Amino acid sequence: NFVTLARSKFYDNTIFHQRPVVEVGQKVKKNQLLADASSSDMGGLALGQNVFVAFMSWGGANYEDAIIISERLVKNQTFTSAYIEEFKTNVRDTKLGPEVTTPDIPNVGEAKLKNLDEDGIVRLGAEVTPNDILVGKITPKGETELTPEERLLRSIFGDKARDVKDTSKRVPHGKKGKVIGVKVFSRERGDKLESGITKRIHVEVAELRNVSVGDKLCGRHGNKGVIAKILPEEDMPYMADGTPVDVILTPLGVPSRMNLGQIFEMHLGLAAKTLGYQAITPPFMGVTDAEIKSELVKSGYPEDGKVKLFDGRTGESFEQNVAVGCMYILKLDHMVEDKIHMRSIGPYS
C-alpha cells in the first residue's frame, strides 16, 4: 500500500526522478535495492558533494559565516541544480465571446512568435527568456462605435478585423530556461474544468542553475552560510604539494555554536579520502577523537589535522598552520536568483 501525502508548497519546483537499478529477468532477494532516486545513490541519501575545505579567515571576505569558493566548483558544475517551474493559463468563455489560442497575435513581431505551434502553444525544447510568449491567446474586447474605416475593414475581412486584445501567457521577468513539458486539458476531450473555462494549458520550464555569489550552502551540522566570493583557482590557498582548497570557511562560526561535529567530519574525511575508504559513523556514539588522530597519522598528516598553506596570490606561506579536510557540502534552495526585490519610485513610508 502506498501512503498518500497532501501536496504542499514545500515541494514546489522539486523534481522527483526515480530510476531502476535492476534489469528485466534479474533475480532479486529480500531487502535488495530496486530503484534509486535523483537524491540517492545505492539507497543512501546523496544530496551534496565532498569538497576540500579549509578553516581560515581570508581578508575578511568570509566574515559573518560568509563562504569563499573556488572557481573550479563553478567550471565543473559541482553544485549545479535543475530548477523546474510550471506556468498555467486558462482559456475562458467570456460574455463578448470565447478566448482563442493562436499564433496570430496582433502587434507582435515574427521573432516572438517563432516558437509557437499552429495552436499558439510553445513547442517542446524551445529556449525561452523573459517576456517570451508561452501561450498565444487573444480575448474579445468590448465593441465601441466603429469609425467608417473600421466599418470598411469589417465588411472586407469580416470577423478578423474585430477588436481583440493580447492576453498571452508570457515568461515573467527574471525567469528563463527550456520548455520540457506541455499539458493541454480541454472540456472537448472530457477533462473536468471549472465553469467558464474551456481549456487549461500547463507549460513546464526547466533551468540549470550553476552556483553563484549569494547562493546558500550548508554542511551536515547546521553550519550554513552564503557565498560571498568566487575566487579564481590560482588565488585559492594551496598545500605544499600544490593542491588548492575548494572552500574557505570561517573558524569563528564554530566555537559559539559548539557544533564540533564539522571539525571531526573534516579530519576523518581527509584521512578517508587519502586512504581510499568511506567512513560511516553514527552521531554521538561513533568514531572517537583518538581514532581520528590515528587515521590522520596513517594517512600521512599530523594528528591535529593542520598543515601549512600558501597564499595563492603571493605564494607566501601563512603564519599559522591551517585545519584542512574533506567535508560534505549541500546547496540549499535559497538561491540568489529568487531573492530579487524592487520598489517603484516614490516617497518612503
Q: What would you call each of these model-derived segments?
A:
Residues 1-17:
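Cyclophilin-like peptidyl-prolyl cis-trans isomerases
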Residues 18-349:
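Intrinsically disordered, low-complexity regulatory segments
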